[in-house]
């Protein structure tokens, strides 16, 4: 797909449309083949667009939506009471084929509920899972679930592993190493659902399952795809982001302590800046909702302009790779034994 069309929920997130419009226009400039549909309060979006010079309007359309979903709104209210919300209209553009992906920084629960209702799940998938990249010593790994499913059955963990493996392949990883996050690497460790999931994964043909991985092994790069329930995954993700921010702040403080440390810091500045960029949460912003019949990427509600750009770039890659269809084909093979 040479010219992806991405639908942007312009009203979602903590900062409203200002950051989202700015990030969208930056991506439009950086990717000449990209087309965007900004969904939300049209008059406000047009006003923000007008404040930027040289916008290619041939690749940008504004779709009006009269409602928006608050970050603390119940998913049921978003689903039943707001048929013209920016989030829902953006998803409907994907459902109707007018866009290949949706990106939103809005209410996570509402996005999950609306995505399931508007786009539906792939055959054999009970619930979508949220997946994102986290940095490791050797690069990064894909971690799922990140909070969409707090309690998971063994079957759900199995489905997550299959979907995560396919996503890693679309990102260029050959035979992705898939592991279950656990409190130990021994077979006797873990709760009942993790142990049952391990049995399912060991029997799965075509899946490079390597066993259990502990939290420190995730950061050592021992696996390309790490599977866990949404409670554990969300805690791990937020801890990773907090740790990265803390390390960057401590490094800055260390090299600004006195004249000598500032001189040493100046010499090391290129390497330090590279480390900060590699670890910056904004660079890894964007969690995919896997298992849907369409591409949906969830940005942090508090994402910066560069962070939201990362979420859009993830949507571009997944739409170009036609990820839902690739997942559908692999799932048909992996679930051929009738276990769905």
Swiss-Prot record:
SUPFAM superfamilies: Isocitrate/Isopropylmalate dehydrogenase-like (SSF53659). InterPro entries: FA_synthesis (IPR003664), Phospholipid_synth_PlsX-like (IPR012281). Pathway: Lipid metabolism; phospholipid metabolism. GO terms for biological process: fatty acid biosynthetic process; phospholipid biosynthetic process. Keywords: Cytoplasm, Lipid biosynthesis, Lipid metabolism, Phospholipid biosynthesis, Phospholipid metabolism, Transferase. The keyword Glycoprotein does not apply. One of its GO terms (molecular function) is phosphate:acyl-[acyl carrier protein] acyltransferase activity. Its EC number is 2.3.1.274. Pfam families: FA_synthesis. GO terms for cellular component: cytoplasm. It is found in: Cytoplasm. Transmembrane segments: none annotated. It comes from the Bacteria. Gene3D superfamilies: Isopropylmalate Dehydrogenase. The keyword Transcription does not apply. It catalyses: a fatty acyl-[ACP] + phosphate = an acyl phosphate + holo-[ACP]. Homodimer. Probably interacts with PlsY. Belongs to the PlsX family. Catalyzes the reversible formation of acyl-phosphate (acyl-PO(4)) from acyl-[acyl-carrier-protein] (acyl-ACP). This enzyme utilizes acyl-ACP as fatty acyl donor, but not acyl-CoA. This is Phosphate acyltransferase. It comes from Pseudomonas syringae pv. tomato (strain ATCC BAA-871 / DC3000). The gene is plsX.
């Amino acid at each position: 797909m040479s010219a992806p069309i991405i639908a942007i929920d312009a009203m979602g997130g903590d900062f409203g449309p200002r950051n989202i419009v700015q990030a969208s226009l930056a991506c439009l400039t950086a990717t000449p083949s990209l087309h965007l549909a900004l969904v939300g309060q049209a008059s406000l979006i047009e006003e923000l667009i007008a404040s930027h010079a040289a916008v290619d309007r041939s690749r940008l359309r504004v779709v009006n939506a009269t409602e928006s979903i608050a970050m603390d709104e119940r998913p049921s209210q978003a689903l039943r009471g707001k048929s013209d919300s920016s989030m829902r209209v953006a998803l409907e553009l994907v459902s109707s084929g007018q866009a290949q992906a949706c990106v939103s920084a809005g209410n996570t629960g509402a996005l999950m509920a609306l995505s399931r209702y508007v786009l539906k799940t792939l055959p054999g998938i009970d619930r979508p899972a949220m997946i994102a990249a986290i940095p490791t010593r050797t690069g990064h790994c894909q971690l799922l679930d990140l909070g969409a499913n707090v309690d998971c059955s063994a079957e759900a963990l199995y489905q997550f592993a299959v979907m995560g493996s396919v996503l890693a392949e679309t990102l260029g990883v050959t035979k992705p190493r898939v592991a279950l996050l656990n409190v130990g690497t021994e077979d006797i460790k873990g709760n009942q659902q993790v142990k049952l999931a391990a049995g399912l994964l060991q029997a799965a043909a075509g899946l490079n399952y390597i066993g259990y991985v502990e939290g420190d092994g995730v950061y050592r790069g021992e696996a390309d795809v790490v599977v866990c329930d949404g409670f554990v995954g969300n805690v791990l993700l937020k801890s990773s982001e907090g740790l990265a921010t803390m390390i960057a702040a401590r490094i800055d403080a260390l090299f600004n302590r006195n004249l000598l440390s500032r001189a040493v810091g100046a010499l090391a500045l290129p390497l330090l800046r590279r480390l900060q960029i590699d670890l910056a949460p904004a660079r890894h912003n964007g969690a995919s909702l896997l298992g849907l019949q369409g591409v949906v990427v969830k940005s942090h509600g508090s994402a910066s302009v560069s962070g939201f750009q990362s979420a859009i770039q993830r949507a571009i890659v997944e739409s170009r790779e036609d990820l839902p269809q690739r997942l559908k084909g692999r799932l048909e093979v992996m679930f051929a034994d009738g276990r769905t």
